[in-house]
Every structure is written in C-alpha cells, then in structure tokens.
A protein has these predicted regions:
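RNase H-like polynucleotidyl transferase catalytic core
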Residues: 94-95, 99-116, 135-137
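Basic, flexible linker segments flanking DNA-binding modules
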Residues: 1-17, 82, 89, 167-174
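Mobile-element integrase/transposase regions
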Residues: 1-39, 47-54, 186-201
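Protein C-terminal end segments and domain termini
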Residues: 230-381
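Active-site beta-loop-alpha junctions of metal-dependent nucleic acid enzymes
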Residues: 42-69, 90, 247-251
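RNase H-like two-metal-ion nuclease catalytic core shared by retroviral integrases
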Residues: 72-73, 84-85, 105-127, 143
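Acidic/histidine-rich, metal-coordinating catalytic segments
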Residues: 66-86
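Active-site-proximal acidic segments at structured loop/helix or strand boundaries
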Residues: 123-224
Length: 381
C-alpha cells in the first residue's frame, strides 16, 4: 500500500529489558511513517490502553505534531467488536484520545497484517538495532526519552528505495502533520474500587492486590492508573499511596506499610486484632511480641519513621538484626538502622605484615585498685 506523507502505522512488539538489574518481559510500541520510513518506539511493562496512549502522546510531543491518519490492527486494547459491515466498536477512552488529537483511524482487515507491512518490518528492525543485546538501565521513563533521540538519529541514513535520506523525507511527513492540541490529554484511567476489611483492593480479575490504608477499609476509593503506577486517591483527589503497577497473569501483592504502621502506633492494643499482624514478616511479629505492651506504640512509631525514611524492607531488616541481639528498646532499633543504612562503609580489619612484631595482650588486674580504694576509704572515715 502507498501512503501519503503524514500517515503512520502502529503496532506492539515483545521485548525483554533489565531495569535496576531485574529482567522484565515487556512490550514496545512502534510508530512508523511509511512515506519516509522514519520510526519511533517506546518500552513498556505490558500492552494496555495506558501504554498505548502514553506511548503515542510521547511520540507526538517529541516529533512536534500529530499524524493525519493512524493504521492499527484489531487489538482488544482499542477494538471491542468488529461489525459485519466492517466498522468497529471502539473503547471509550481511545475515542476520546482520537477526538482530542484529531487524527483519523484505519483498521486492518482480520488476518491481514500485511496491510500495515511497514510497521511490521519496523518492529523487527527496532528489535534488532535497539533492543539487542537486552538493554539495561536504571529507570524506564528516562530510557524511553533516550530511545526517542536514538530513533531520530536513526533517520540519518538513506531510504531503502527512494534516493534520499529518511530524515529529509520525514520533513515532508511533518509538513502534513496536524498541530498539537493546546490542552494536554490525561492518559490515566480512573476507576472506583471497593476495599476489604484490611483497606485493600484487587485489580486484573482478582490477581493483583494493592493496599490503601486502614482508614479506607470497607469503602469505595477512586484509583488512578497509569502504565507505571496505581494510585489510590482521597475524597479531595490527593494521592494516598503510590504503587508500582503489577503485571503478569499470576497472583501478586503490593503492600505499602506506612499508613498501617502509623495507625497501629496510635492504637497498639489492637495490633493482634487488626489483621495486619498476620501478614507482617515473622521476625517483626516476634520482635513486637517481645516488647512490653507499654512500649509497643513507641516501637511501632519508630518502625513507621524508619519505613518512611528508607523503606519497609530496610526497617524489617533492622528488626531482624536487633532481634539477634535480643534488644527490644527504641534506642537499639534506631542505632541498628543507622548502622545498616549508613552511607559510610564499614572498613575491614587492617592486615599487618609479618615483619611487624605482635604485642602480647595486656591484662589489667583491678583487684589491687579495689583494695587501695577500700583502705583509702577507711582512713577518711
């Protein structure tokens, strides 16, 4: 198919990547421009409506305009039903996005992926040239910004068929783009969920569990969903906690302990009846059991402070260490946490050369001092 300048094709591909040393089986959104053969990609943890819209929005803003027409396959992310006469029922979120940016859409016939052959080829090209070997980075958001620059630089080569550079042909694409809207489009999804007695809720057909706060137990909560985060919000639309969005078709849980620890610190007597006690790490339960009842509120308050400062995992590690020393006081807890989380590295023992003489240890006999002190005391009495 011949495409006029300004049109684009869209498709997802499979990709692996390491973020902070953790391997992810993710997806990457490809947008290709058949006229010039310019292409762009964005990496994501999965393939959903938030990934699609965030990726398109990022690419539109980077290239400074909106393609006149976008070609898609019949992905469930967009298409809810294919009608007999060839038209499609589309998701409400995508229709609002399309209306906001003003582009037209074309959907390929079922089993006819060749109708968007340019982007099919670009999916493979991007994988071979930008995702092999498996990329490693610290933060996905920043890496996606780097990918846009790399894709732009990739246009500085000759077109496979036309006697010109891709970057120059892409200027013709740009001349036909629609202008970016004056107002920004919110790509996040907003949903109302019902929390259980522990102030937690489920997404993805009950597979993914997220916490809110004991304050929001057995109630309805508005949640904001992006490709990266799940964010429960209060009645004033303020963020309560922020979870990294869970991906995968298996049971997972994301627990933010800070609101629960703060609540328990105010009512330590309800610790074992709250339901939260049962899901605490075993060492933390043992530690709290050893504490005096009168000290539990203060201990929980300190654990909450340590969690806020360096995360629950580090706070739990601190509890495990002080438990080894059978120390259940607040000062030991704070001191151990400072030791474990200090940026000052603990130096190993210094090794001495064999030529340096070894001194025998000197033992001090304090009994003579005791005798002298007793005699001195007698003389003054």
């Amino acid at each position: 198919l011949e495409h006029p300048a300004g049109e684009a094709q869209v498709d997802f591909g499979d990709a692996q990547f390491y973020e902070n040393g953790v391997l992810h089986d993710g997806k990457y959104l490809n947008v290709s421009f058949p006229y010039s053969n310019q292409g762009y990609l964005q990496l994501f943890y999965g393939e959903n409506i938030e990934c699609l819209l965030e990726g398109l929005k990022a690419i539109f803003e980077y290239i400074g305009g909106v393609p006149t027409r976008l070609w898609f396959d019949n992905t469930k992310t967009i298409v809810t039903k294919i009608l007999k006469e060839g038209s499609r029922n589309l998701t409400e979120k995508f229709m609002r996005f399309r209306e906001h940016y003003g582009f037209d859409t074309v959907f390929c016939n079922p089993e006819a992926g060749h109708e968007k052959g340019n982007v099919e080829s670009k999916v493979g090209y991007h994988r071979r040239n930008m995702l092999v070997p498996i990329p490693r980075f610290q933060e996905l958001r920043k890496y996606n910004e780097e990918l846009l620059v790399k894709c732009n630089e990739d246009g500085n080569r000759e077109h496979y068929r036309k006697a010109d550079f891709i970057s120059k042909l892409f200027e013709e694409d740009k001349k036909n783009f629609l202008p970016l809207p004056a107002t920004e489009f919110d790509t996040a999804g907003y949903h109302i969920v019902h929390t259980n007695g522990y102030g937690r809720f489920y997404l993805n057909n009950g597979l993914h569990e997220y916490s809110v706060s004991p304050k929001y137990a057995n109630t309805r909560v508005v949640i904001k969903i992006t490709s990266l985060y799940v964010i429960p919000m209060d009645e004033n639309q303020n963020e309560i906690v922020r979870h990294k969005r869970l991906y995968g078709d298996h049971k997972q849980q994301s627990m933010k302990w800070l609101p629960y620890l703060r609540q328990l610190a105010k009512r330590p007597g309800a610790l074992k009846y709250s339901g939260i006690y049962n899901i605490m790490p075993e060492d933390m339960k043992k530690y709290l059991d050893k504490c005096k009842r009168s000290e539990r509120g203060k201990i929980l308050s300190v654990i909450a402070s340590l969690t806020e400062k360096n995360g629950f995992e580090n706070a739990a590690q601190t509890v495990t260490q002080v438990l080894c020393y059978d120390a259940v006081d607040v000062d030991s807890l704070i001191s151990m946490h400072r030791h474990l989380c200090s940026e000052i590295r603990e130096l190993p023992p210094m090794k001495t050369e064999s030529r340096i003489p070894r001194l025998k240890p000197t033992k001090t006999d304090l009994s003579k001092y005791d005798k002298a002190l007793k005699k001195w005391g007698k003389r003054t009495c």
